[in-house]
Amino acid sequence: MSEVKVSAKMVKELRDRTGLGMMECKKALEESNGDVETAIDNLRKSGQAKAAKKAGNIAADGAIIIAQGDSKAFLLEVNCQTDFVAKDENFAAFAETVANLALENNVTDVAAIAELPYGNGQTVEEARVSLVQKIGENIQIRRVEVLEGANIAAYRHGLRIGVVVSYEGGSAETGKNLAMHIAAFNPVAVADEDVAADLLAREKDIIEAKARESGKPDNIVEKMIEGGLRKYLEEVTLLRQPYVMDNEKKVGDVLKAEGVKVLGFKRLEVGEGIEKKQEDFAAEVAATQALANK
């Protein structure tokens, strides 16, 4: 396998996502042959990237729009370059219109949404281009998520986080509280069995690597792995999390007492996985590398 040259952009992405210094990030990327995700895993295994949650840092602006029908809800992310434009009435009107068009036409593909008739003889894409020219910022329709169900609760936290949750039983207030909880705690799944196998395997690998570094006997290491996985599932599964309305109780216990079953949910947060441009970063990295090579 040929060696990948570590670029300033790659170093910046790893630095933004871990909070580590430039030289540490450069070294980690060299060891992972330029693979950012592998570098993050390796840093977590070694204990350098202790703030694991920083791996999901937000680095873009825009808005999440919720369009809701009788038995279906659409979440749409529309991006811009600054929070100033995200609050602009022209941007907001465009984003709301596009979300409602997607719902009305039941279109779940971003490319297909771009071709929908927007009005005034324009398609959505043509309206987007016109808005870019008017506002002076790049604007993109990034992604759409759809949730179906007889009972759907929705919650939007500011402009940046949108949640829809499908459930059976309970009241509308319970549904709204659930959506608020998901916005705040960001679970990846409803229950343990819903966590993706690859995600669980990746986390187990990281936990095991750190446990074995302790030098303890295998039977103790196994218990450390079990404990680590249990803690991980308590953090990422909805039913195991402490309830946002009463953190003395677990979500699962509250729902059981109220006769509520969660069928599914969708959560979008503006800019997940997108990095902002930092104009002088390449020069900063180059200067640091030059010093390191002296």
Swiss-Prot record:
It holds the Pfam family EF_TS. Keywords: Cytoplasm, Elongation factor, Protein biosynthesis. Coiled coil: none annotated. It comes from Psychrobacter cryohalolentis (strain ATCC BAA-1226 / DSM 17306 / VKM B-2378 / K5). HAMAP family: EF_Ts. The keyword Protein biosynthesis applies. It comes from the Bacteria. GO terms for molecular function: translation elongation factor activity. Its main location: cytoplasm. Residues 82-85 are annotated as: Involved in Mg(2+) ion dislocation from EF-Tu. The keyword Cytoplasm applies. This is Elongation factor Ts. Associates with the EF-Tu.GDP complex and induces the exchange of GDP to GTP. It remains bound to the aminoacyl-tRNA.EF-Tu.GTP complex up to the GTP hydrolysis stage on the ribosome. It is found in: Cytoplasm. The lineage of its organism: Bacteria, Pseudomonadati, Pseudomonadota, Gammaproteobacteria, Moraxellales. Belongs to the EF-Ts family.
